[in-house]
Amino acid sequence: MTDTDVRAPGSTFVERSVEAAGFTVRYLEAGDGPAVLYLPGAGGPVMTFALDSLAERFRVIVLEYPGWGAQPNDVADFDGLAAQVADIATALRLDRFHLMGTSFGGACALHFVTHYADRVDSIVLESPAKFRESSVHPSTLAPEAFVKAFRSHPDRLPHMSSPDPAFMARVWPTVERLMGDGSDDGLVEQLVDVSTRTLILFGRDDGIINPINGRTVRRYMRNSSLQYVYDAAHDIQSDRPEAFADVVADFLARGMNFLINDQDGLINP
């Protein structure tokens, strides 16, 4: 089967916008059921088959961060971005919801839950980029190594594409300002008080955020489960869409009673 025989990832989603936090915020939405607010990586929304699968059971809302569109965002830190996300959630009439974040979005989700835990039913962190011991800055990688760090299966849809230079020039200073060096003693002190159920996922072959950082996140979050995904790099959704969607959907539906136990594990093919 060729790519032309397969529907495009995200084909079930509808693009909308909402006025919130002083911005016109673009988002994509599909599905019915309990709401899942998804915070994507630093490159903005990338639609995947995993999101399509989750939308079969949940109302999935994929945000484009304020400042990732035409309007600039001078937010100073992740706490400020989390406050903007909270305003967007309110504008979308989301009182309580599941929160899912990828890489940069995972870092934002950690800050969000320390301030708005009463709004979050559960958290899913895909390759979260908050703690980055022995990790790699993408800008230091040659093109072939860059692809390998993100994807174990770059042949699978969606294919990786080169970042748009104009987008990078506009957005990347904000990303670097918020990310810093990944350390945050203040956040650690707050995370230890968070009881929200949390699923932490790392691709075993992640070449951007070293998977050892999953243990750091788990150590700070007392009600969490850490799972390593076999045959996946940084972008788990694209490398293993079925496995990602299955384990996330089960976790969102059943919490810590989901199909994998609460010990560190490995999701096999």
Where are these regions (language model features)?
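Short alpha-helix in the alpha/beta-hydrolase fold that links the catalytic acid
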Residues: T196, N210-R219
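Catalytic active-site module of serine/aspartate enzymes centered on a nucleophile-bearing elbow/loop
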Residues: S224-S225, Y230-P269
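Acidic catalytic loop of the alpha/beta-hydrolase fold
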Residues: D205-I209, H234
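Short beta-strand/loop motif that positions the catalytic acidic residue
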Residues: V194, I200-F202
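Conserved HGGG/HGGXW glycine-rich cap/lid loop of the alpha/beta-hydrolase fold
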Residues: E19-A70
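Flexible "cap/lid" loop of the alpha/beta hydrolase fold
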Residues: L110-H115, D121-R151
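Active-site nucleophile elbow and catalytic-triad environment of alpha/beta-hydrolase enzymes
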Residues: P173-Q190
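Active-site loop/oxyanion-hole signature of alpha/beta-hydrolase fold enzymes
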Residues: I61-M100, D246
